[in-house]
Structures are given as C-alpha cells and as structure tokens.
C-alpha cells in the first residue's frame, strides 16, 4: 500500500509512521535552508540590510518566516507523535539548533524593531502560538527547554494580537495570510491550552462581534485563484469552537444555507505547481479538508449535513495530499505543515 492510500484509509487523526517520515523529510530539508528567501522586512537604516539568518536566526529557512515557524511546528508535532521513529532524532536536532535562548532573543529584538508592528500579523503570530502550544503539551525535557526559550517571543505575539484586535474594526475576509478567522482558531486553541484567559476572552468577543450575525456566505464564489484558505469554511471552523452544537447547527444553517450543494465543494486543480501563488490551491484543498472535518465535529450526531461534509472532506483530503511531494520548493516548503495539521487532526484536539 502506498503512502497516500495509508492516509486515506486511516481513521481520523491516525497517522502511519511512514507518512509522518515523508512529511518530516520536507521540513528537515528546509528549516535551515536559507535560500531562496522571501523577506517581509522593513528597513529603517542601512544597518538593517542583512541576510535572513542574521535578521531572524531561529526562523530563517523554508522560504519565509511563517513557513519556517510552522515547519518547526511540524517537526515538533511529528517527533512528539512518533518519539521512536528514525526521523524523530533528526527533528529534535533541528529544533535544538534553532530554538536556543540566544536565537530567540534575537527574534524578539527583530519583531520589536522599529516599523514592524504588523510583522506576520496575524498568520505568522498564530503559527508561532501553535508551535508554542505543541512544545508546552509535549512531555519531553528538551521540549520543555525549548518552550521556556520561546516564552519571550510567545509573549510578544500575544501582546501584538491583544493590542491590535480592539482596534480592528472589521474582520479580514480573504483567502491568504491576512485572514482573521483562521488565525483566530489557532490563537484560540493556544489561549485555551496555555490558560491565557484574557486572550481567550478577547478572541471570543471579537469573533462574536465579527461573525455571529453573518448570513449567506458566498461559498460558490470561492476560491480566488491564489487562495489557500477558505473565508467561509474558516469562519465556520472558528465558530464551532465557540458555540454549543445545537447553536452552531442553527448558525450554520443561516451562514451557509446551501451547504448541501456539492458543486461548491469540489477540490481545486493547480495548473502550475512551480508557480508559488498558483500552488496555493493545493494548500486550499488541505485546509478545506480539515475545516470540513472541524465543521462536521461541531454538529450534532444526527445532523443530516454530516454525511455530505464527510464526503467533501475526503475528496479534498485526497486531492490535497496527492500534491505533497516536494517536487517543487514553491509547495514543498509549506504543504507538509498543512498536511500534518490535517492528518493529525490537530484542530480537533
């Protein structure tokens, strides 16, 4: 049985070690690969013109900062899940190389630098919190040390979100990094896991304000040609985290009244995987799959929509995972993280 068949026939959240090794290999190949590199870098003086590893010495690989962060999360997630696997030792060595107190102090200094108040907000900050949560939950002495070293940067991420959200007058409803719904889900999971009641309360209030009265989300108009997140499904996946099942079912009926239309839930096809923006649609198939699984989990057991949602999730899962090959770095530097988030059912735990 090939690796894709192993994933597609496994129960939700169950992962074969061979599949995990495949995804770990992608992250190991990029977390310390400095080039090519796409910087989101504000320069305030000539002294700010430095190579990526000098600017952000923990998270300089995997093409961009946020992909490096979730590449490290992938390694932590899979090494935690498969501590005896051959790849686990390599994953821990990579984490140990990156997550030093010195490197992370430099990351704090960079993020707090002049002109960087919006750096990686909200997407990269949310993934940083997801990395922190993985390390916090991992019962391992090395993970505890890395989590401790990460705490100052974690605190900066929380502070940035808490300062920004009260001023954000509208949600950001796009299919790429700036989207608020997806980032809220990651940040909310961290706040609950870390016991940060203040951030949890703020995210809950903002989500209710932004989304609770939404109706008739135009799912049929999705996706944009370079989306990797569904605005409609991400919003629903967030709200199922906040509402009891009966209330979520009622909210979903008005938010997505045509949710039984399979035409709006067909996987997308990438026409050129060597194009970094067009390749986003492979990630969309993966994120749609886990969002559909989340929505299904948020509905009562007897809800008639569950069967259709499960079918749609499976078709998107198959289409998305088939693309996680590493053939092109444009997708190889990040799709493994999305695949890992999906197959380990991280959003449901």
Predicted regions and their residues:
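Low-complexity, Ser/Thr/Pro/Gly-enriched N-terminal "stalk/linker" regions
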Residues: 13-60
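HEAT/HEAT-like alpha-solenoid repeats
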Residues: 25-32, 36, 57-61, 96, ...
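Surface-exposed peri-terminal alpha-helical interaction modules
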Residues: 84, 100-103, 135-140, 155-158, ...
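Solvent-exposed loop and edge beta-strand segments that line ligand/cofactor-binding
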Residues: 12-16, 52-69, 109-125, 167-180, ...
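Long, repeat-rich segments with strong aromatic
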Residues: 192-328, 334
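Extended ligand-binding groove/face enriched in aromatic
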Residues: 54, 69, 78-194
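Hydrophobic alpha-helical targeting segments used for export or membrane insertion
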Residues: 2-12
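Well-ordered alpha-helical scaffold segments within catalytic/enzyme domains
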Residues: 12-15, 29, 69-85, 126-142, ...
């Amino acid at each position: 049985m090939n690796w894709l068949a192993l994933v597609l026939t496994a129960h939700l959240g169950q992962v074969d070690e061979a599949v995990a090794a495949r995804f770990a290999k992608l992250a190991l190949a990029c977390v310390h690969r400095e080039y090519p590199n796409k910087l989101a870098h504000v320069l305030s003086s000539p002294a700010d013109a430095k190579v990526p590893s000098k600017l952000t010495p923990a998270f300089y690989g995997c093409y961009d900062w946020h992909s490096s962060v979730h590449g490290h999360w992938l390694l932590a997630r899979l090494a935690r899940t498969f501590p005896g696997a051959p790849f686990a030792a390599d994953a821990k060595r990579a984490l140990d190389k990156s997550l030093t107190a010195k490197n992370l102090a430099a990351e704090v200094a960079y993020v707090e630098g002049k002109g960087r108040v919006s750096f990686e907000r909200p997407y990269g900050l949310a993934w940083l919190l997801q990395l922190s949560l993985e390390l916090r939950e991992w019962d391992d002495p090395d993970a505890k040390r890395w989590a401790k070293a990460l705490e100052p940067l974690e605190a900066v991420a929380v502070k940035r979100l808490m300062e920004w959200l009260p001023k954000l007058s509208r949600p950001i409803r796009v299919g790429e990094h700036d989207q608020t719904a997806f980032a809220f889900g990651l940040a909310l999971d961290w706040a609950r896991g870390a016991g940060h009641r203040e951030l949890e309360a703020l995210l809950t209030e903002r989500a209710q304000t932004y989304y609770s009265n939404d109706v008739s989300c135009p799912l049929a108009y999705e996706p944009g040609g370079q989306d990797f997140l569904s605005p409609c499904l991400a919003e629903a996946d967030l709200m199922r985290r906040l509402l009891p099942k009966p209330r979520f079912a009622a909210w979903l009926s008005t938010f997505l009244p045509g949710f039984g239309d399979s035409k709006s839930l067909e996987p997308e096809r990438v026409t050129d995987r060597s194009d970094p923006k067009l390749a986003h649609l492979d990630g969309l198939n993966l994120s749609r799959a886990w969002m559909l699984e989340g929505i299904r989990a948020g509905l009562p057991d007897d809800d008639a929509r569950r069967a259709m949602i499960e079918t749609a999730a499976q078709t998107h899962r198959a289409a998305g995972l088939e693309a996680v090959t590493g053939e092109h770095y444009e997708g190889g530097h990040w799709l493994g993280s999305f695949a890992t988030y999906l197959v380990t059912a991280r959003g449901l735990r």
